[in-house]
Amino acid sequence: GLLGFVGSLLGGLGI
């Protein structure tokens, strides 16, 4: 999500 790590799973905004 955010930068392509855990954020991707929660946010889904990035890689």
Curated annotation (Swiss-Prot):
Which organs or tissues contain this protein? Expressed by the skin parotoid and/or rostral glands.
Subcellular localization: Secreted
Residue numbers bearing the Isoleucine amide modification? 15
Can you tell which superkingdom this protein's organism belongs to? Eukaryota
**Keyword Secreted carried by entry:** yes
Mention one GO biological process in which this protein takes part, according to its record.
Answer: defense response
Gene Ontology CC terms, in alphabetical order: extracellular region
Name the keywords, alphabetized. Answer: Amidation, Amphibian defense peptide, Secreted
Which residue spans adopt a coiled-coil conformation according to this UniProt entry? none
Q: Predominant location of this chain?
A: secreted
Query: Which residues pair up as cystines?
Result: none
Per the entry, what this protein does is: Caeridins show neither neuropeptide activity nor antibiotic activity.
Protein name, per record: Caeridin-6
